[in-house]
């Protein structure tokens, strides 16, 4: 059940926004206060740059899960001088009290947990629309939807036929929203694109979209790949998923994980964390992989590496973590045992062929938990309609690990906004010394004390005493 959106007029905030309930703002503020104690990186950036305000003049269109942790990110960007407009990058991931806390500060936010796809694309458009008729000059993206909207809309201005044949439900609503906007303002997207100085991207999926544009020569502005900062991918993707996956499964189903047979599809950083998560609670975990290196890693960690087709009838829990398309298809779904749990922790909902299940009997148990009766008579439990389970059925990653990721995001925004003319129309990563700085900012909070190199030791391994300590090609 979607909460009725509350408009800014009703709130009398003097700011345009769409949220579920402004009365949750006080609750959101209390949780924000707790989160700040677990986000030392962001707090350090506020202290370091708060007076200087390096983002003064930045107009940031933010498309990223509207959680309590994201609210801390937003407040940091504003503290550093930026103007911000924000939408969630997933229809189920918003925490309504977090959105209310941001709206109460007169920051434009457009996010409601359980929003429709039509609303989702409307809200993504809203972050590109400044009240004075201007445009954003920066994008902070998660999954690439805001960047992709600007790019596809620009193409449609030149050739409307690119919107003729949507391939799925998501594209149907996306294409309709672009057509609607073009009817109102035929040059909206090209004007917006021309103003963008750079984009910073949070996720593996969004980064892949950026590299694809770079390869084809279509990338119109510099981009920073935040995902491949070591302090993002090796922490958020791995340790974040290690805690949030089982949290979401247990909140959704109350199932006992110990003793269950679980299959994790994909053994990248997200898959590694997911496998550890399930094993840690006593599940017997198998891995499905296409990459021989990742498959060998899984085998060496003691996981059984299998093909989905060979074990689909045995597994109690299925988790997709690939970032790919149609990983679990209808022929697999129909063979699953009774009460098998099916979920996705990759970015988009098309890893599982949810569309093929629409003709079956659905019984909604509670928000984002559905029983689906298969032709065999067996029922499977689908979580978050195949979208991100840890944000749909729980609250995502813990604050501490998100501080790593979001500290990288702020540094990337500062870098592109203040030095954008030094970058070409390519995808970059943050330099190693900033990666190490992000890690250093988080050590005190967990009581970690660094050993220091002597000058002789540093010379012996040919690194500066103060770092960086590893070459760029080092894999960690």
Curated annotation (Swiss-Prot):
GO CC aspect terms: cytosol
Pathways per UniProt: Amino-acid biosynthesis; L-homocysteine biosynthesis; L-homocysteine from S-adenosyl-L-homocysteine: step 1/1
Protein name: Adenosylhomocysteinase
Ligand binding (NAD(+)): 203-205, 237, 266-271, 289, 324, 345-347, 390
Coiled-coil region(s): none
Origin: domain of life: Bacteria
Main location, first listed in the record: cytoplasm
Keyword Iron: no
GO molecular function per UniProt: adenosylhomocysteinase activity
EC number annotated for this UniProt entry: 3.13.2.1
Cofactor note: Binds 1 NAD(+) per subunit.
Binding of substrate, residues: 67, 142, 202, 232, 236
Species annotation: Parasynechococcus marenigrum (strain WH8102)
Cited HAMAP family: AdoHcyase (MF_00563)
Family listed: Belongs to the adenosylhomocysteinase family.
Function: May play a key role in the regulation of the intracellular concentration of adenosylhomocysteine.
Keywords noted in UniProt: Cytoplasm, Hydrolase, NAD, One-carbon metabolism
Places the protein is found: Cytoplasm
Reactions catalysed according to its record: S-adenosyl-L-homocysteine + H2O = L-homocysteine + adenosine
Keyword Cytoplasm in annotation: yes
Cofactor(s) named in the record: NAD(+)
InterPro entries: Adenosylhomocyst_ase-like_sf, Adenosylhomocysteinase-like, Ado_hCys_hydrolase_NAD-bd, NAD(P)-bd_dom_sf, S-Ado-L-homoCys_hydrolase_CS
GO biological process: L-homocysteine biosynthetic process; one-carbon metabolic process; S-adenosylmethionine cycle
